[in-house]
Amino acid sequence: MAHKKAGGSTRNGRDSESKRLGVKRFGGQVVIPGNILVRQRGTQFHPGVGVQIGKDHTLFAVVEGQVKFEVKGKLKRRTVSVVAA
């Protein structure tokens, strides 16, 4: 009789789904209120003028205008603003 020994088991084979984080609207792009600008974990980017932050640290536009990325302050914080186009 033909025999085949049992194959060993593996402890691999799992991976989490990617979360699609990152900058969604780049500098100079025109946005309307509600547009998501940045999806992030923690505050890599801080909200500036015309931008608010969601409970998952998502930055979104609250006014219509052009996206502007800046480095501000003594702590060199990266901020995202929406200025009138």
UniProtKB/Swiss-Prot annotation:
Family annotation (InterPro entries): Ribosomal_bL27, Ribosomal_bL27_CS
GO biological process entries: translation
Cellular component GO terms, alphabetical: cytosolic large ribosomal subunit
Region named Disordered: 1-22
Protein name: Large ribosomal subunit protein bL27
Family: Belongs to the bacterial ribosomal protein bL27 family.
A Pfam family the protein falls into: Ribosomal_L27
Record GO terms (molecular function): structural constituent of ribosome
Lineage: Bacteria, Pseudomonadati, Pseudomonadota, Gammaproteobacteria, Oceanospirillales
Top-level division of the source organism's lineage: Bacteria
Keywords of the record: Ribonucleoprotein, Ribosomal protein
Keyword Ribosomal protein: yes
NCBIfam families in the cross-refs: L27
Keyword Repeat applies: no
